[in-house]
Amino acid sequence: MNRKAILGAAVLPHPPLAVGKVAVDKKEIIKKTIASFQSLAKEIERLAPQTIVLISPHTNLYADYFHLGSYNEGEKIAWGDFSRFGDAESRVAVGFDEPFIDALAELCQKEDFPCGKLGKKTSFLDHGITVPLYFVQKQYSDFQLVQVGLSGLGLAEHYALGMKITEIAEKLGRKTYIIASGDLSHKLLADGPYGYAAEGPEYDERIMAVLERAAFGEMLDFDEAFLERAAECGHRAFCIMAGAFDGLKVDAKKLSYEGPFGVGYGAALFIPKEKDTARHFLEAFREKEAKKNEERRKNEDPYVQLARASIEHFVNFGKVLELDAKLKEKIVLEKEAYTKKAGCFVSLKKNGQLRGCIGTISPTQENIAEEIIANAISSASRDGRFEPVRVDELSSLVYSVDILSESEAIASEKELDVKRYGVIVSAGHKKGLLLPNLEGVDSIDMQVSIAKQKAGILPHEKVSLERFEVLRYE
């Protein structure tokens, strides 16, 4: 087994305007970024890898699965060009390292890790791949490619994939270089293509500081909601790259940073050094999360305890939790939980991201406690947006329970308040609901628009409106 299979790595952006005849008049503006691509190409030529693992946010992306690039049936070359960016002449072509890809997919299947070749096959390479390769192949072309996509899973899962990539490189004795392709924030300028958000420059400053210090453990601490507001592109790709160096000291070199068009372009190189037991960042992160979850459980509201117990019982045993005397002694609920009826929603989050949310506008069970049990099970097993919750996920879930008041009809949107009131929109037999005080929903227009979308109501359709209040338990 080759313990030095990973020769190095790079973080790079992927602006097509850096390539060939694309936007020739703008190349001087991003000359630092172009110089960084050229520096990378020379570094790769010096190291002479057999395989380049290239991680791209624009490769096929799935909510709960990492896709590894593979050819269309009958093809043996992967390729991409820049015709859609105005340059029909510049192109790249490369072969996939199929033994590496197959070995990685096999390892992931063996370890029940959601990564492999089950996604859509295509020999066409996205620009997250082709932009870096355009520069690399000008200097060095004696390599094969492993194309890695991102997923909707948490940052820790991305980091873990990087560790598995290193494991396969070492097992095969393959001299490997890793490129994490990704722009930084897309929200740097008010007059930029994506507008401005304060989180944009903040993200770029933070991530560049992390990269300069090779402080890879800090990558896992970025809040998911913050990342979304910053509109970053490459953070998950950077986490995969970071995982490839778990347990190793790393020399880092910042190449450049600029954002003249409202999108951050950061570039850095990394060289692995000796082992360092203090840099097992995934292990440390999971220990920290376990302590946080344990503390959270100690302070959970009884309604949340009931939702958690319902899901854990159902996932482990496939049975509905019974409200017997033993349970009532363990989870002490207010009297009204057994005497009153109300609609409720149970929401699940994992790694800061929604993992399930189902509820009832009006009560369907004998009491609030039974309503929570029923909706908790539905959230974990019947939310069509997600696969059913697995046993190994239970310890990572964060719960909230919303108990709804009776709704009241209102005449217009002026009577709404996104923090205080949830909204119900109706058009004919279509009805949609959105809870109040949701992260990222900061206007009445957005609240109503999302509720319409959930109901399958077109944006221009007239709707009747109802509002309601909730008591949220966490």
Question: What role is predicted for each listed range?
Answer:
Residues 51-53, 177:
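Structural motif
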Residues 381-410:
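Catalytic phosphate-donor-binding core of small-molecule kinases
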Residues 149-203, 348-368:
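Active-site beta-strand/loop microenvironment that shapes enzyme catalytic pockets
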Residues 295-343:
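Short, basic/aromatic recognition patches
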Residues 1-50, 61-163, 191-305, 392, ...:
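Flexible, D/E/H-enriched segments
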Residues 65-68, 341-355:
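Polyanion/phosphate-binding surface patch
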Residues 58-60, 184-185:
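Catalytic metal-binding/acid-base residues of hydrolase active sites
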Residues 361-388:
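A short mixed-secondary-structure module that forms the rim of ligand-binding clefts
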